[in-house]
Amino acid sequence: MTIQLKCLSHTPLRGINDPGAATVAEVDAVLAKAKAEVEAFDPELIVVFAPDHYNGLFYDLMPPFVIATAADSVGDYQTMTGPLSVDKDLALEMAKFILDSDIDIAISHRLQVDHGCTQTLEEMTGSLTRYPVIPIIINSVAPPFGPYRRVRKLGEAVGKFIAKLNKRVLILGTGGLSHEPPVPLLSGANEDIANFLIAGRNPTPEFRAARQARTLATGMIFGKPECELTPLNPEWDQNFMDLLIRGQLDKVDAFDIEEISKAAGRSTHEVRTWVAAFAAMAASGPYNAHQDYYRPINEWIAGYGVVSASQK
């Protein structure tokens, strides 16, 4: 049993609304190095903790956590479409273990996933199908949210399960860091928006294009005076990464959801995927972790970070 971890920000605006060439080159180099490390590790299983952005999960039934035994990418923005190579039998075994660990997790036998899951998988492996994968989606954009303590405990259960496997396992956490894209809230939404948030599966190409155009338009003004959304918060991002790197996972239990939203943006809660990933890593034993990269990138509406960890 050998376990490695990569936690990365994702951004659908990468390649669509890029910052300066020097910053793009920095990120490309960091991702190329991370991908080479994954290839050298040659995982026999990837467990990916990811959010959804109202592409697969909606308020008609919004689980805090869901594990997929089969998953297809919707191909939003510039991501690949098609099925992921989900290990169905192992996913079911993991789901049972999580439930036996007193963590209520939903199970999907036909889950649609978006860039929140697939972009990092593509960046790290070049494919949706190269390695067996188990996707675990953590609600990070559709309030109300459960406490971060529950996310940590989910990660611990996953980590205890994979520690029993005689496999090379890569844990991916994808999301955050500080950011607030134009994701609508159900509270106060008009009828059309509310209907989409409740049951907006399989939108028309025109609807998806219009939605993506709004995100692009926001990226073009994000961080400027005319943008009313919460700006990026590099200090918050750095403190969060440092906490995980130092292994102080118990501190996330005190995280206040509203305070995080106000300080770093409503979609910052995608860092729940990082919390779960590091909790899974810690459950397998002591680890060494380091920060590979960080830069606040307004054009991508993201505090963009990359962190890696391996067993001691």
From Swiss-Prot:
It comes from the Bacteria. The keyword Oxidoreductase applies. This is 2,3-dihydroxyphenylpropionate/2,3-dihydroxicinnamic acid 1,2-dioxygenase 1. Belongs to the LigB/MhpB extradiol dioxygenase family. Keywords: Aromatic hydrocarbons catabolism, Dioxygenase, Iron, Oxidoreductase. CDD domains: MhpB_like. Homotetramer. One of its GO terms (biological process) is 3-phenylpropionate catabolic process. The gene is mhpB1.
